[in-house]
Amino acid sequence: MAKKGIERLKQWIEESDNIVFFGGAGVSTESGIPDFRSVDGLYHQKYDYPSETILSHTFYRNKPEEFYRFYRDKLIGFEAEPNQAHKKLAQWEQDGKLKAVITQNIDGLHQAAGSRKVLELHGSTLRNYCEHCGKFFDVEDIRNGEGVPVCDACGGPVKPDVVLYEEGLDQDVLSEAVQFIKNADVLIIGGTSLVVYPAAGLIDYYRGNKLVLVNKTPTARDGVADLVVQGAIGEIFGQL
């Protein structure tokens, strides 16, 4: 069935110049980045507090030392390279087929692969800002530092540009994502279980008839998809 599905997806991609991709953690797991919700993902690794608690706005405010210990260890403590999925998406954009990548990931791997139009719903670990004066710090500044990072210009606290639990998504990014999805001919959703809202609700804005779900395991929305291809997204995209 997967082979048949891949052939149909290949045909849709060949025929379209208005593809939008919406992806989650599964897109980056083949690059060695742990998925929050999989059995061996972040939420199942032992720490003093549950990951959901540590990655919350309240915890960041109240226990910044513990937050940054976890953040350095689990979110930026490794070098990752783009995989087949990232590279293929960048190629489709270059070929004039793909209009945008909408991602729930915070790792910057789409840009590293060459994608230009990337809407990051949950921000990026590559960007960090002083909360007082707005000075920018890149990920190496945070990775190589110790304890709670402070701004070398004004002494203010430095915060990663990622959306923590209890924080709202950037409304401008969200609105732009909705527009791309509304206007898409082919909407490919990959590497997400479609359980995190409001991001998961974005697919309701799609009005076409080529909704494709690519995921290792079944999702809550398989029933409404026009095509479901089950498997690792990098492997599948490598065949397209």
Model-derived features with residue positions:
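Conserved catalytic core of sirtuin-type NAD+-dependent deacylases
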Residues: 1-240
